[in-house]
């Protein structure tokens, strides 16, 4: 199984920590969106797309990469992962939006993971931030378990074809 993880992580490195834990389980390389050549994404069996959430939005670098991706004709599997200071607001739906964009490109999105991350941006900075210490060991263990389930699903689908 050949895996790639695209991770847009800024501020405190929360999302990168999650990406690294998922990468261990998938034996994957973690790269920033601007380091990805869109034309090679089709060479992977599974691609993870992850971002910190900034003001309820996915990082602009990841959004730009997804827009630039060519259509994939053989349904490469994909997954998403996010860290955020607050819960997703259903009306804004950043996870749904990314999923739909990937599906429009031909990816089969097989899962999503999210957890809280330390957030000291905007008004949270005035109170020293929220979710200090997150993602914590429990969050990272959940990320590893998520990746284990992804691995089984991808390898299982390869064996079936």
Language-model features and meaning:
Residues 3-6, 10, 14-17, 21-31, ...:
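FMN-binding flavodoxin-like domain, especially the glycine-rich phosphate-binding loop
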Residues 33-36:
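Conserved SAM/SAH-binding loop
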């Amino acid at each position: 199984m050949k895996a790639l993880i695209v991770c847009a992580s800024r501020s405190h490195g929360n999302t990168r920590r999650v990406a690294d834990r998922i990468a261990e389980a998938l034996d994957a390389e973690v790269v920033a969106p601007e380091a990805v050549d869109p034309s090679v994404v089709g060479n992977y069996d599974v691609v993870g797309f992850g971002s910190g959430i900034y003001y309820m939005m996915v990082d602009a670098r990841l959004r730009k990469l997804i827009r630039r991706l060519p259509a994939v004709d053989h349904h490469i599997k994909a997954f998403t992962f996010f860290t955020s200071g607050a819960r997703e607001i259903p009306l804004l739906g950043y996870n749904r939006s990314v999923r739909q964009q990937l599906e429009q490109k031909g990816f089969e999105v097989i899962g999503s993971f999210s957890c809280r991350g330390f957030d000291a941006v905007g008004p949270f900075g005035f109170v020293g931030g929220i979710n200090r210490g997150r993602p914590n060991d429990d969050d990272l263990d959940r990320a590893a378990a998520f990746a284990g389930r992804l691995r089984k699903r991808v390898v299982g689908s390869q064996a079936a074809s």
